[in-house]
């Protein structure tokens, strides 16, 4: 089901599981970089697996185990039971245990072969190299290798039992730290809601603490086989905290004309935000944005005092009011007289005495009916103009 090379990267008891390859990839010493790399690469693998399933119609299942012991899985609908059912989870844990055991056994066999080759090579040393052989045996590196080779058998057995107990404790129904992780929910530009049947991502928390006493493997196996349901921990009850602000102190600033409230310190039940300065609704004062001038003050006073709310004018109108509605006076009559005098001069130039018109009462009355023959004296005509303005200057002497 899984490649042994990938399973060999599974970290055991905090040791480095991946030493790198000849292409330049090496184990990241920084923990933060390791976590970021794991998250990005895992998302990329799940995305490629989903594209493969959608484009080719194949059934895909991906299983990724982090260094903390968290299993991330992705599967198509037909393989969903493999990672979702208790039997599938048990199969995954057994596969991981077997792979880890095989890895330890292979390491132990390699160590035994290397120790046997070392003993054979040491027995075949010539007598001339006896001193060199003694110095190598007494060296610190050779002693450490022998101690490692002697402990490799015990290590393979104990590590396999510990890993098996931790794996089965996570799958057991009494385990309360069972975690589920969806590998494709955090992918950018990936529509997980369009194909809900394609995702079956579950996570198993292998171990959360190294100080927990783990029971025997047989007890955990019996508990797992006897039960078929999982007991999840209850969700914590939601707590509602009511927030009440403190009563601010109201202050009026005469310079700015603003009535505002102070923003004092807030208690635990108060909101983290502050109140903005607000103007009073029943008062209107001059602010800095509207500078006051004598003309504006005059307009403001007139608006408050005038019932019609009509501000007075600071300059006279373009048309004098006396021309609109003013009783007749002597000055107005004189202005009308000057205007009529121009008309009289115009008619006098037309009807000159030398032209024979108006020299006598007959000629004047026949030629110009407006000439008054009764007022003609010594050949000087008097004209009577139409009463245009209804004034007393009807008869004017030339």
Curated annotation (Swiss-Prot):
UniProt xrefs under Pfam families: SRF-TF (PF00319)
Source species, domain of life: Eukaryota
Residue ranges occupied by any MADS-box domain in the UniProt entry: 20-74
Localization per Swiss-Prot or TrEMBL: Nucleus
A Gene Ontology term for the protein's cellular component: nucleus
Chain intervals for the UniProt region annotation (Disordered): 1-30, 101-125, 254-317
InterPro entries named among the record's database cross-references: MADS-box/MEF2_TF, SRF-like_MADS-box, TF_MADSbox, TF_MADSbox_sf
Keywords: Activator, DNA-binding, Nucleus, Transcription, Transcription regulation
Main location: nucleus
Keyword Transmembrane attributed: no
GO molecular function, one term: RNA polymerase II cis-regulatory region sequence-specific DNA binding
Bias kind Polar residues: ranges: 262-273, 282-294
Protein name: Pheromone receptor transcription activator
